[in-house]
Amino acid sequence: MELKVLNISLNSLNTVEVDDTIFARDFNQALVHQVTTAYMSGSRQGSKAQKNRSAVSGGGKRPWAQKGTGRARAGTTRGPIWRSGGVTFATQPRSYAQKVNKKMYKGAISIIFSELVRSERLKVVKEFDIKEVKTKNMIALLKVLNVKDALLMTDELDENLYLSSRNLYHVGVCDTQSIDPVSLIGYDNVVVTELALKKIEVML
């Protein structure tokens, strides 16, 4: 398969040959969903904690005698039915991580890229020419590329590109080492440099 390589003026410079087994795979919704869900689950902090009856301070002594008072027996004032008592099924810190094989993860990334190519939402450019850190330069670049909501991908993190775009909520910047399924499906368009595309092909 061949993809057009554009310059910043959207003129086609040349084409780049890409592997069909990576950029022309059939869509597998179940795999993409599983990998995306696993990635999001792994991002959860999982530090929520509540106190059960044994973790609440106090309540060591019986509030009244077992027999003779006429009241219902009670062994502690920290049971779940008491005011200031513990939580019945208290949540504890836990990991929400799900295991995903490398082959499955790479397969899902490849399928997402294939779908981007099919829907013409993947643009390949020679390079991003951002000489200085200015948001207006980034807005001008997006206007030329005819995209509003986009993930810009480079082979190595471009500091000028990142700093120029960080004030735009609908624009993301990453390098090939930081690719994740949530970012790829979270933007309307993905704009990738030619060098980054070749790196991705080697990685997948």
From Swiss-Prot:
The protein's name in its UniProt record: Large ribosomal subunit protein uL4
Assembly mode: Part of the 50S ribosomal subunit.
Superkingdom classification of source: Bacteria
GO molecular function: rRNA binding; structural constituent of ribosome
Listed Gene3D superfamilies: 3.40.1370.10
Key words, A-Z: Ribonucleoprotein, Ribosomal protein, RNA-binding, rRNA-binding
Low complexity bias locations: 68-79
Organism: Vesicomyosocius okutanii subsp. Calyptogena okutanii (strain HA)
Protein purpose: One of the primary rRNA binding proteins, this protein initially binds near the 5'-end of the 23S rRNA. It is important during the early stages of 50S assembly. It makes multiple contacts with different domains of the 23S rRNA in the assembled 50S subunit and ribosome.
Region named Disordered: 42-85
Protein family: Belongs to the universal ribosomal protein uL4 family.
Transmembrane found in the keyword field: no
GO process terms (BP): translation
Coiled coil: none
GO CC annotation terms, alphabetical: ribonucleoprotein complex; ribosome
Biased composition (Polar residues): 42-55
